Amino acid sequence: MKQIINLFLPNLKSMRTVFYEVANTSVSRERFVDFTKIAGLLFLMINSFTLLRLHDSGGEIFVSNLSANSESLMVVTWFTAGMSLFFFSMGFNNLIAWYSNVGRDGSQWNYLVDRINTLLGPVIVWIFSSTIVLNILSRSENFPNYLTTSEDGIMPSIEFILWPLWLVSIYLVMVLFAPFTIYLHKKYPYATVLTLITMTILIDNIDFALNLSYLKLFNYLFFWIVIHQVGYFFADGKIQKVNINVFRYVTVFTYGYLFYQMSASESYLSLASYRLTSLNNEDPPTTIYLIASIGLISLFLSLKNIVENILSNQKLWLLISHIHSNIYTMYLWHLFVFFSIYLFGLTMYYAPLILLITAFIFGNYERSMFKLSSNLVKRVNPLQPWPSPIKARFSINNFALAWLSALLVLLGVIHLTLGGIGQDGFFTLREFYFLRSNTYEGIGRIFIGLLLLNITVRGLKYKKRILGGS
């Protein structure tokens, strides 16, 4: 119980952990990947504070996206497609984590537990804390339950605030499919990526009949696996062998194509829609989003050596690491902060300060779990021989339980993402395809999934302890 309570309380000890990790950072650590991950989430937050606007009109609260009607801001979103940068870095981290677990002791289920716990910790803190705060605020007459979009659509305020959960849902899908995608990358790296890119482009450009329109949703899977797979290429060293000028040419070509599309057609080219308009490039991802993502990743790769040299400065690396140790917390809370600034009549200049205070108060778990490679530990080489099959008893059962537990967590997160937390009451039933439940049941799925997930790792220890005691 004490450990659970400590998750929600600020702790200076967790901040000292960051100093220790920075001092012991391995010289072989890919600091560029850390920078890319941080930049991706910061871009998403910057987009929210610069592109979104809330204003009163005729008793309604209108939410607008400035990039929807401004060509110059549309161009800005091409360079701030932060979610693509984030999942590129996650592809790198997930492949390294897979080999760290499977390559050493063959525990594929331990990989799932580690990867999911890393992000779900801050998410659980956020869900519980925001549930309490939002339900208190919603009792106020000044709290708008719904927002009106530019197309006269209605969006629940809570759903708007919980938009960051979409990243969590995609992250969980990438982790769930990682064992399969890593196998494909090992056997058919280039064929896999080319096939996924082709499928993404075809699904986006084919006009399906109305009864087959659901096929467009497959681009959620194909598109993000493509970006994730590119991170695999960086992790196993294939990208590092490419001449840096190639990335510069790809950057010029992709952005040149986007500028051509802007001048030659009337296509909607913003990459930051926040589900506020029927026309968008993220829901599901389109060819335009794919081209912009490839261009942005290539731009970052062309600057890799410069970034690495800058991050070799220990003081700057300390600053970056402090941001890194709180980045999930800041990202999850940033739309809550944005909405609160409007609600209390503050200016956006307060946003950085409020975000820092929020990260200090609610980021204790993330900081305490923050790890950088120690000088005493060598990074696992992804090029090592493919791990032999596990010989441990019931290993298939453990992996199946871990996978199904992760799926249960994913369903709970999707339910909260679409239904909101406490919107119109905790017991209001919400429907999404085959999901039909209230908020308590959605949160229950997450906790049951996490409980079962962690049993796959810790269950054997408990069994040995019980048998040893008897």
Positions of PLM-derived features:
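Alpha-helical transmembrane segments and their immediate juxtamembrane cytosolic regions
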Residues: 2-470
